[in-house]
């Protein structure tokens, strides 16, 4: 998500905790599985300006696979992503504060809410799907594609939880290759990744010729 920016810099300290767990089972020729990934991150600085960013990121994936013809196995996956981030900036020095800027990307900021709006939070619920085709024997064609979409909503809590922008991130990945042998074999593959970002800003409040 796009940050709150200011004119003074400095190093940041961060703590990150992550875990991943999975489960798999089989019923006749059908295989099923699930996976959970969680990340928590805390980023801060002890000198002015003092940002404090807290992130929680949870991804849940479910999948199933079954034989396709006699030489391959087809797998389908789907999942959800739950993202939340809080962002606060504090000033403790006697000299006062400096303006904060809510960035919109491409070097632009939201002038209507820049200045003393030093708090924001972001939330998103995304989804992803995937298809995999793998050979069941020692050799064969391999194919994989994944699509994910996550809209990040930026909200100002000090203005009655006013949503001011949405950042939509779409990701498309694909791989195709050939596997020859297993223990002493080789694998040749080509991969491509495409990401598209779209922004949507909300116009709120009364108009002003200076904004």
Name each model-derived stretch.
Residues 10, 41-55, 118-122:
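Outer-membrane beta-barrel proteins
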Residues 27-29, 38-42, 80-84, 147-153, ...:
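Transmembrane beta-strands of outer-membrane beta-barrel pores
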Residues 49-57, 91-100, 159-165, 204-210:
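Flexible, surface-exposed loop regions and adjacent strand-edge segments
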Residues 28-34, 70-76, 127, 137-143, ...:
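Outer-envelope beta-barrel architecture signal
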Residues 155-159, 164-168, 174-211:
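Long, charge-rich C-terminal accessory regions
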Residues 13-19, 52-58, 123-129, 149, ...:
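Residues that define the transmembrane beta-barrel architecture of outer-membrane proteins
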Residues 19-25, 60-66, 80, 129-135, ...:
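Residues on the lipid-exposed face of transmembrane beta-strands in outer-membrane beta-barrel proteins
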């Amino acid at each position: 998500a796009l940050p709150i920016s200011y004119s003074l810099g400095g190093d940041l300290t961060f703590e990150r905790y992550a875990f991943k767990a999975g489960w798999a089972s089989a019923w006749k020729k059908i295989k099923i599985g699930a996976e959970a990934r969680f990340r928590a991150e805390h980023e801060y600085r002890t000198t002015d300006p003092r940002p404090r960013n807290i992130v929680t990121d949870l991804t849940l994936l479910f999948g199933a696979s079954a034989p396709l013809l006699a030489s391959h196995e087809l797998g389908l996956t789907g999942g959800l992503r739950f993202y939340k981030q809080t962002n606060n900036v504090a000033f403790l020095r006697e000299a006062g504060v400096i303006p904060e800027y809510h960035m919109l990307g491409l070097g632009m900021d939201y002038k209507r809410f820049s200045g003393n709006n030093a708090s924001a939070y972001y939330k998103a619920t995304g989804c992803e799907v995937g298809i995999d085709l793998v050979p069941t024997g020692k050799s064969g064609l391999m194919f994989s594609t994944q699509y994910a979409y996550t809209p990040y909503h930026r909200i100002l809590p000090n203005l009655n939880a006013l949503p001011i922008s949405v950042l939509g991130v779409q990701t498309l990945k694909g791989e195709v290759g050939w596997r020859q042998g297993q223990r002493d074999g080789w694998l040749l593959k080509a991969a491509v990744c495409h990401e598209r970002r779209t922004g949507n800003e909300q116009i709120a409040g009364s108009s002003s010729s200076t904004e």
